[in-house]
Amino acid sequence: MIILDNSIQTKSKAYSISKLITINTLGPEGTSSEYAAKNFITNFTLLQGVNSKLSLHDTFESCIEKTLQSPLEYTIVPHAYDGIKHFYMRPDLQLLQIFRCDTPMYGLAVRPGFEYTDDMLDKAVIVSHPSPINLIKYFTRKDVTFDLVNSTSAAAKRVKDGLSDIALTNELARQKYGLHFVKTFKSIPMSWSLFGKGEIHDEN
C-alpha cells in the first residue's frame, strides 16, 4: 500500500485521498513526534495535493491501533522508540516510507524563578521520556535518576504543574509550558517510519 497519484493503492483496491487521511503520532502538543508529523504533512502530503489531518495519542501503540482500523489512517514513529521493532514484525502493518526530520533542541528545563545549580543533578529526579535520557549522560557525565513519562511534552507539563522540578524536554514543549532552559544539549538527528495498514493473505 502506497500513496500515489492522488490515491492510496493496495493490491485489491484504490482509495481516493480526497476523503482525507489522518497522520497519527505521539502527543500531547509539543512532542518531537508532533513536530516531525507536521513536517511530513508540509513537505509530502500537501505537496502531493493530499488532504490530511494530524491526530495525537498517548502512546505509539494507540496510534497503531487507529492505523489498523482504516487504510486512510497512518502512523509516524521515530527510530529512537524502542518499541518500533514490534511494528516492523506485524503482518497487519506495512512500512510505507522512511524520512529524516531532526528534532527541536533538547535541554534541561525548570519553572521560572526556580534556582537551579549543577550539583542538583547528583540528587534530583529528572522527568523525561525514555528515548532521550542518554543526552544527560553524554553531556553532563553524571549518573542521574529519572522519572519516566510517555512524552517530552508530558515531562515539561509535570514541571509546569509543580510535580517535578527539572525536565529533559524539547524547545517546543519548553515554550508551550513557559519553562526556562538551564542547559541545552542538541537537536537530535532523527529518522522516522511511516506505517500504514497492511494486507494479510491466507497462505493455506
Swiss-Prot record:
Q: Name one GO molecular function term.
A: carboxy-lyase activity
User: Which branch of life, at top level?
Assistant: Bacteria
Where in the cell is the protein located?
Cytoplasm
Q: Which reaction does it catalyse?
A: prephenate + H(+) = 3-[(4R)-4-hydroxycyclohexa-1,5-dien-1-yl]-2-oxopropanoate + CO2
Its GO biological process annotations read: antibiotic biosynthetic process
Signal peptide positions on this chain: none
What Enzyme Commission number(s) appear in the record? Answer: 4.1.1.100
Membership in a protein family: Belongs to the prephenate decarboxylase family.
Primary role: Part of the bacABCDEF operon responsible for the biosynthesis of the nonribosomally synthesized dipeptide antibiotic bacilysin, composed of L-alanine and L-anticapsin. Bacilysin is an irreversible inactivator of the glutaminase domain of glucosamine synthetase. BacA is an unusual prephenate decarboxylase that avoids the typical aromatization of the cyclohexadienol ring of prephenate.
Name recorded for this polypeptide: Prephenate decarboxylase
